[in-house]
């Protein structure tokens, strides 16, 4: 059998730090970000289905979110101000991402490629799937800002404001529910979130 470097590459996502131009109280890597996005995207899909009459595959949404930044193992995490400096740079970066996604897909053994390709290639996502993953991605970046600000790091003030605008642009009923039910706890200490359910 031919060896594949696919998972060896994905394992290196933990070596790529997010927010590279910002001073962080706690550094966040792409691997842990992807897990959080998967959990939040799954929740958004479940909320959409249970509360607002949606009919999306929540487990697939979680998988798409797990792999949504996989190409960054080849491209790195380009800072947002650079990535979106102008439309030409944004367009070129999208083309680079597409090449990186295809390179990852090509690493997967041929007999498994049809399973992994639709998870890695964002062009295979439906509009609804893409929307839920993007909502979760923005929500997790917003939560990171809240955590940094709570730790006294004002470096994230402008990022929080920018992300509030992004969340407003991507607003949905399931996001409103998540913001109302789950986000307030991110402003609390461990003691405060633990007092109702001590071990």
From Swiss-Prot:
Q: Where is the HD domain?
A: 30-142
Q: What is its EC number?
A: 3.1.3.89
UniProt cross-references to SMART domains, sorted A to Z: HDc
Which catalytic reaction applies to this protein?
a 2'-deoxyribonucleoside 5'-phosphate + H2O = a 2'-deoxyribonucleoside + phosphate
Please provide one cellular component term from the Gene Ontology annotations of this protein: cytoplasm
- Lineage, top-rank taxon, reads Bacteria
Q: Where in the cell is it found?
A: Cytoplasm
Site (Appears to be important in orienting the phosphate for catalysis) location in chain: 18
Intrachain disulfide bonds = none
Q: Give the binding site residues for substrate.
A: 18-19, 33, 69, 77-80, 137
Function (record text)? Catalyzes the strictly specific dephosphorylation of 2'-deoxyribonucleoside 5'-monophosphates.
Please state what the protein is called. 5'-deoxynucleotidase YfbR
Task: Give me the gene this protein comes from.
Answer: yfbR
């Amino acid at each position: 059998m031919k060896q594949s470097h696919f998972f060896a590459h994905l394992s290196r996502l933990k070596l790529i730090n997010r927010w590279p131009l910002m001073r962080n109280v706690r550094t966040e890597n792409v691997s842990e970000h992807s897990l959080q996005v998967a959990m939040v995207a799954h929740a958004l899909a479940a909320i959409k289905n249970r509360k607002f009459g949606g009919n999306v595959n929540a487990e697939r949404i979680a998988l798409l979110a797990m792999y949504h930044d996989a190409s960054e193992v080849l491209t790195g995490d380009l800072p947002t101000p650079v990535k979106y400096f102008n439309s030409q740079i944004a367009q070129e970066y999208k083309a680079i991402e597409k090449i990186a996604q295809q390179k990852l897909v090509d690493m997967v053994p041929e007999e498994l490629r049809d399973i992994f390709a639709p998870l890695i290639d964002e062009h295979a996502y439906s509009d609804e799937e893409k929307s839920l993953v993007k909502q979760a991605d923005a929500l997790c970046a917003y939560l990171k800002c809240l955590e940094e600000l709570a730790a006294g790091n004002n470096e994230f003030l402008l990022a929080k404001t920018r992300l509030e605008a992004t969340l407003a642009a991507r607003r949905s009923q399931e996001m409103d529910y998540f913001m109302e039910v789950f986000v307030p706890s991110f402003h609390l200490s461990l003691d405060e979130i633990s007092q109702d359910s001590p071990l």
